[in-house]
């Protein structure tokens, strides 16, 4: 699973997911990308499930780039514990994703295979996504 090697602070506040993504909104490395259309927390397990699904769809050919990293810890209190007594233990790691963020990129495979691989990855995610080509800005090609 993806997670930071070490962090300055073990626990974080939840924060808010307002607005659109500031960076990472264009396909930079591959030929096709998977773009988020909704805000969400994507867990390390979901990212790994997407990676495996794409590898299977691409039959281990081509290259995959994961453009998000789970760097935010999320905590959970034990079941049936009363309120208070401090913040819960770190349960896992999430990547904060805002609309417009490119999640995954693929290259080295034909268009049909790339679309299929990214569609499989999208089925593992809890948000709406769309497949975008490398040079796609608005409606025109660059």
From Swiss-Prot:
A Pfam family hit: Ribosomal_L16
CC terms in the record's Gene Ontology section:
cytosolic large ribosomal subunit
* InterPro entries assigned: Ribosomal_uL16, Ribosomal_uL16_bact-type, Ribosomal_uL16_CS, Ribosomal_uL16_dom, Ribosomal_uL16_sf
UniProt keywords, alphabetically:
Ribonucleoprotein, Ribosomal protein, RNA-binding, rRNA-binding, tRNA-binding
One GO term under biological process is: translation
What are the protein's GO molecular function terms? Answer: rRNA binding; structural constituent of ribosome; tRNA binding
The organism's place on the tree of life at top rank: Bacteria
Signal peptide boundaries: none
Q: Could you say which protein family the record assigns here?
A: Belongs to the universal ribosomal protein uL16 family.
Subunit composition? Part of the 50S ribosomal subunit.
Q: What does this protein do?
A: Binds 23S rRNA and is also seen to make contacts with the A and possibly P site tRNAs.
User: Could you tell me which HAMAP family the record lists for this protein?
Assistant: Ribosomal_uL16
Q: What is this protein called?
A: Large ribosomal subunit protein uL16
Tell me the classification of the organism that encodes this protein. Bacteria, Thermotogati, Thermotogota, Thermotogae, Thermotogales
């Amino acid at each position: 699973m993806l997670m930071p090697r070490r962090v300055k602070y073990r626990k974080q506040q939840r924060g808010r997911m307002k607005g659109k993504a500031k960076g990472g909104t264009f396909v930079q490395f591959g030929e096709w990308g998977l773009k988020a259309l909704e805000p969400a927390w994507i867990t390390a397990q979901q990212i790994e499930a997407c990676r495996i699904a794409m590898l299977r769809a691409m039959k281990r050919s081509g290259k995959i780039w994961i453009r998000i990293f789970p760097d935010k810890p999320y905590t959970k209190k034990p079941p049936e514990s009363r309120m208070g007594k401090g913040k819960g233990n770190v349960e896992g790691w999430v990547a904060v994703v805002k609309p417009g963020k490119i999640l995954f990129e693929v290259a080295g495979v034909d268009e049909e295979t790339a679309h299929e691989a990214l569609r499989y990855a999208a089925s593992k995610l809890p948000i709406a996504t769309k497949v975008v080509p490398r040079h796609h800005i608005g409606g025109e090609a660059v």
